[in-house]
Design a protein with these regions (language model features):
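Conserved hydrophobic/aromatic pocket- or pore-lining residues that grip, position, or stack substrates
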Residues: 19, 29, 47, 68, ...
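Non-catalytic accessory segments flanking enzyme active sites
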Residues: 1-41, 63-66, 70
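Short substrate-entry loop that stabilizes the transition state in hydrolases
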Residues: 37-87, 134, 159
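Short, conserved glycine- and acidic-residue-centered signature motifs
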Residues: 12, 61, 99-102
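Active-site-proximal cap/loop segments of hydrolase catalytic domains
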Residues: 78-172
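Conserved helix-loop functional segments at active or binding sites
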Residues: 2-5, 35-37, 55-58, 112-116
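Short hydrophobic segments within beta-strands
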Residues: 32, 48-49, 127
């Protein structure tokens, strides 16, 4: 047993889902509901976009998602346009779309979960790191009415310098 302490806790199941963006693109994601979730119950949700954007989420254990879910939150992880593993065509759909259609993909995943009857729309948060942090900050400025809280850490906040290499400072 590599982690015997885990059996003391009930972990939440992660399930794949497919949704359609507002402009008709078929996208994929994962939804995690709390272990004690009751059918038909509307619960607080956390939208959790991955970093990257040239990355993706995977169907497997994620300690941050489990932390949220075991405390009563539903969690949506979505592979928005530009996520890896879906081919060149989807990568091209992301060109020049940071803060635009890539951002809308996150809201569309939330609306999918709401349409399934899961979401208490008065208690939605967005949380992310790296590009996910950027997406969270975009949510704060573009759609603050959707979110009760914004959690952004180690984010990409300066797109102009995002692709610069090397040290971006000098000694005084």
């Amino acid at each position: 047993e590599s982690a015997p302490w885990i059996k003391n806790y009930q972990l939440a199941d992660i399930e794949p889902f497919t949704y359609t963006s507002r402009d008709g693109i078929k996208l994929h994601g994962y939804i995690t509901l709390p272990p004690n979730y009751k059918d038909g119950e509307k619960i607080p949700f956390i939208i959790h976009p991955h970093g990257g954007p040239n990355a993706r989420d995977y169907w497997g254990y994620n300690p941050e998602v489990q932390f949220y879910a075991t405390r009563g939150y539903g969690v949506i992880q979505m592979d928005y346009r530009g996520s890896t593993g879906y081919g060149r065509k989807e990568m091209i759909l992301a060109n020049h779309q940071m803060g635009k259609k890539m951002q809308e993909d996150k809201y569309d995943a939330l609306m999918w979960a709401n349409d399934q009857g899961y979401v208490d729309m008065d208690n939605v948060c967005i949380s992310g790191a790296s590009y996910g942090g950027y997406a969270a900050m975009q949510a704060a400025t573009k759609n603050p009415e959707l979110f009760k809280c914004i959690i952004a850490y180690v984010g990409v906040y300066d797109l102009t310098s995002m692709d610069l290499r090397g040290l971006q400072w000098s000694e005084l």
